[in-house]
Curated annotation (Swiss-Prot):
The gene is rpl7ae. InterPro entries: eL8/uL1-like, Ribosomal_eL30-like_sf, Ribosomal_eL8-like_CS, Ribosomal_eL8/eL30/eS12/Gad45, Ribosomal_eL8/Nhp2, Ribosomal_eL8_arc. GO terms for cellular component: cytoplasm; ribonucleoprotein complex; ribosome. One of its GO terms (biological process) is tRNA 5'-leader removal. It comes from the Archaea. Belongs to the eukaryotic ribosomal protein eL8 family. Multifunctional RNA-binding protein that recognizes the K-turn motif in ribosomal RNA, the RNA component of RNase P, box H/ACA, box C/D and box C'/D' sRNAs. It holds the Pfam family Ribosomal_L7Ae. It is found in: Cytoplasm. Transmembrane segments: none annotated. This is Large ribosomal subunit protein eL8. One of its GO terms (molecular function) is rRNA binding. It comes from Staphylothermus marinus (strain ATCC 43588 / DSM 3639 / JCM 9404 / F1).
Length: 128
């Protein structure tokens, strides 16, 4: 199945797992996250997001299509995960989350830094 048009680079499954773990760990260890596209968009516009996570299975895709462009404009790293349902679970909500943002990584600081480094390498390879 082809990726939606807003997915600018391929994220390996191992990295996606680390992302779910980082969201959950940040939430559970005194960090701060934003859940959902409205909150995520505001966090990016305010320049307070450390890492933005965008689900690949969002329908319609236009809901999150603006996020990669906005993140690039604000120089905020972003990463894709395959499942909005798992992203919602990692964020601690009962419903799916099309996107989320880590504002303060809390105890997931090292994990978030590692993810950002891997994302930069993936984007460089993909020319994204």
């Amino acid at each position: 199945m082809s990726k939606p048009f807003y997915v600018k680079f391929e994220v390996p499954p191992e990295l996606a797992e680390k992302v779910y773990e980082a969201v959950k760990k940040a939430r559970e260890t005194g960090g701060k996250i934003k859940k959902g596209t409205n909150e995520t968009t505001k966090a990016v516009e305010r320049g307070i997001a450390k890492l933005v996570i965008i689900a690949e299975d969002v329908d319609p895709p236009e809901i999150v299509a603006h996020l990669p462009l906005l993140c690039d404009e604000k120089k905020i790293p972003y990463v894709y995960v395959p499942s909005k349902k798992r992203l919602g679970e990692a964020a601690g909500i009962e419903v799916a989350a099309a996107s989320a943002a880590i504002i303060d990584p809390g105890g997931a600081k090292d994990l978030v830094e590692e993810i950002i480094k891997q994302v930069q390498e993936l984007r460089a390879k993909a020319g994204a």
